[in-house]
Swiss-Prot record:
EC number of the protein: 4.2.1.11
Alphabetical list of SUPFAM superfamilies matching this protein: Enolase C-terminal domain-like, Enolase N-terminal domain-like
Gene3D superfamilies per UniProt: Enolase-like C-terminal domain, Enolase-like, N-terminal domain
Protein name stated in the entry: Enolase
PANTHER family the UniProt entry points to: ENOLASE
Protein source organism: Klebsiella pneumoniae subsp. pneumoniae (strain ATCC 700721 / MGH 78578)
Entry GO terms, CC: cell surface; extracellular region; phosphopyruvate hydratase complex
Associated pathway: Carbohydrate degradation; glycolysis; pyruvate from D-glyceraldehyde 3-phosphate: step 4/5
Cofactor note: Binds a second Mg(2+) ion via substrate during catalysis.
Cellular localization per UniProt: Cytoplasm; Secreted; Cell surface
Coiled coil: none
GO MF, any single term: phosphopyruvate hydratase activity
NCBIfam families given in the database record: eno
Annotated keywords: Cytoplasm, Glycolysis, Lyase, Magnesium, Metal-binding, Secreted
Length: 432
C-alpha cells in the first residue's frame, strides 16, 4: 500500500499573474507528487467551480486561500492513511466530501490539484513515469501514442487584446514523422509568421497562449497570413500542415445572434455562421473547428454537425465541459464529433479519464487541452500519451508555461521510441 502521510496546499502564481492552487501529496517511503490547477478565461457556464476568495483587497479578489484551506484541512484529513494507488477511491472521497454537483464547496481547483498530485505520488511509488501510471488507470497499460499538436499561433477573442473575434487560429504539423519534428515545423512557421506580420507593419506581441495577437482586417486575414508563413517556411499547406480554429463562439453570441466585430459587426444566425465557417473551410485546409456555436445552441450545433460533421472535426469545449453527463446527451443527439478535454472543467483525474473513454467508445476523438492560465505543470503531456488521445492543444511556440508541455512530450517520445507512434493526420476526425 502507498499510504498517504501528508497533504500540503499552497497558493502559487499562474501565467497571467493570478493565484492558483498547488498541492503536494506525500506517501510512506518518501514518495511525493506535486501538481497545480490551471485556469481558463473563456469558460463554459457548466464547468466545475473554480473557488476564488472574492476579497478585493488581495489579488483583486482572485486569491485562492479558501481553496488552499480546503486542501490543508478537510481534504487532507479525509485522505490521510489512504492508498494513493486507488485513484478512483481518492477522487470519490474528495467529491463526496465536497457534496456539490459543481465542486463549489472546496473548489475544483483544490480537488484537481490534489487529484493530480496523488497520481504523481502513486506513479513514483510504483517506479513508473506518470504516463505509464495513467495508462494503467485508464485500463490501457502499455498503449501509447504521441499526440498531434494544435499550435495556437494567432490569438484573438478572450485571449488577446485585439479586434480578432475567433479566439484561436492553429496549425497542425500532420506531415511530421515524429512529435519532435512536428514541434520543429511549428517553431519554424511561428518564426516565419513573425516576419510576415512585421513586413505588413503588424504587431508581434503575444497573447495569453503565446501566439501573436495582431489587429487584422478580418478573421479570414488571420488564415491568409498563416498560409503565407507556412509557405515561407517551406511547407505545403494542406499536406504538411493543416489548420484548426477555436471560435469560442459563446464569447460573441448576443441575443441569439453571432456578432463579429472583425466582420463589420455583422450579426449571423446559427445557420449563417455555420455557412460562414464552411466557406472558410473551402478556402483553407481547416480540418478542425472548436465551439463553432454557443454552448447552449444545441439546435444550431445539430445543424452544424449535419453540414460539416462528415468533412471535418467539430470539437466541443464549452459545449461539453469534459462532463460525461453532457457528453452522453451530445452523443445521443449527434452533436459534434470530438471533445476537448480540460481536467479543471470537471475537477478530477478519474472523471477526466471517464470522459475520454466515453468519447472514444462513441467514435468521437478527444483533444487534450491546456487553459489560457497555466503553470509549469506539464501533466497534460503525460495525459495525452497515457490515454493515446491522439491530439493536444497546448499553445504556441513561446512562453515557458506552453513550451513546458512540448518539452515533456519530446522527453516522453525519446523514452518510448516506437512504442508511441506519431500518427499524424489519421488522429483527426474525418481525416483518416
Amino acid at each position: 500500500m502507498s499510504k498517504i502521510v501528508k497533504v500540503i496546499g499552497r497558493e502559487i502564481i499562474d501565467s497571467r499573474g493570478n493565484p492558483t492552487v498547488e498541492a503536494e501529496v506525500h506517501l510512506e517511503g518518501g514518495f511525493v507528487g506535486m501538481a497545480a490547477a490551471p485556469s481558463g478565461a473563456s469558460t463554459g457556464s457548466r464547468e466545475a467551480l473554480e473557488l476564488r476568495d472574492g476579497d478585493k483587497s488581495r489579488f483583486l479578489g482572485k486569491g485562492v486561500t479558501k481553496a488552499v484551506a480546503a486542501v490543508n484541512g478537510p481534504i487532507a484529513q479525509a485522505i490521510l492513511g489512504k492508498d494513493a494507488k486507488d485513484q478512483a477511491g481518492i477522487d470519490k472521497i474528495m467529491i463526496d466530501l465536497d457534496g456539490t454537483e459543481n465542486k463549489s464547496n472546496f473548489g475544483a481547483n483544490a480537488i484537481l490539484a490534489v487529484s493530480l498530485a496523488n497520481a504523481k505520488a502513486a506513479a513514483a511509488s510504483k517506479g513508473l513515469p506518470l504516463y505509464a501510471h495513467i495508462a494503467e488507470l485508464n485500463g490501457t497499460p502499455g498503449k501509447y501514442s504521441m499526440p498531434v499538436p494544435m499550435m495556437n499561433i494567432i490569438n484573438g477573442g478572450e485571449h488577446a487584446d485585439n479586434n480578432v473575434d475567433i479566439q484561436e487560429f492553429m496549425i497542425q504539423p500532420v506531415g511530421a514523422p515524429t512529435l519532435k519534428e512536428a514541434v520543429r515545423m511549428g517553431s519554424e512557421v511561428f518564426h516565419h509568421l513573425a516576419k510576415v506580420l512585421k513586413s505588413k507593419g503588424m504587431n508581434t506581441a503575444v497573447g495569453d497562449e503565446g501566439g501573436y495577437a495582431p489587429n487584422l482586417g478580418s478573421n479570414a486575414e488571420a488564415l491568409a497570413v498563416i498560409a503565407e508563413a507556412v509557405k515561407a517556411a517551406g511547407y505545403e499547406l494542406g499536406k504538411d500542415i493543416t489548420l484548426a480554429m477555436d471560435c469560442a463562439a459563446s464569447e460573441f453570441y448576443k441575443d441569439g445572434k453571432y456578432v463579429l466585430a472583425g466582420e463589420g459587426n455583422k450579426a449571423f444566425t446559427s445557420e449563417e455562421f455555420t455557412h460562414f465557417l464552411e466557406e472558410l473551410t473551402k478556402q483553407y485546409p481547416i480540418v478542425s473547428i472548436e465551439d463553432g456555436l454557443d454552448e447552449s445552441d444545441w439546435e444550431g450545433f445539430a445543424y452544424q454537425t449535419k453540414v460539416l460533421g462528415d468533412k471535418i472535426q467539430l470539437v466541443g469545449d464549452d459545449l461539453f465541459v469534459t462532463n460525461t453527463k453532457i457528453l452522453k446527451e451530445g452523443i445521443e443527439k449527434g452533436i459534434a464529433n470530438s471533445i476537448l478535454i480540460k481536467f479543471n472543467q470537471i475537477g478530477s483525474l478519474t472523471e477526466t479519464l471517464a470522459a475520454i473513454k466515453m468519447a472514444k467508445d462513441a467514435g468521437y476523438t478527444a483533444v487534450i487541452s491546456h487553459r489560457s492560465g497555466e503553470t509549469e505543470d506539464a501533466t497534460i503531456a503525460d495525459l495525452a500519451v497515457g490515454t493515446a488521445a491522439g491530439q493536444i492543444k497546448t499553445g504556441s511556440m513561446s512562453r515557458s508555461d506552453r513550451v513546458a508541455k512540448y518539452n515533456q512530450l519530446i522527453r516522453i517520445e525519446e523514452a518510448l521510441g516506437e512504442q508511441a507512434p506519431f500518427n499524424g493526420r489519421k488522429e483527426i476526425k474525418g481525416q483518416a
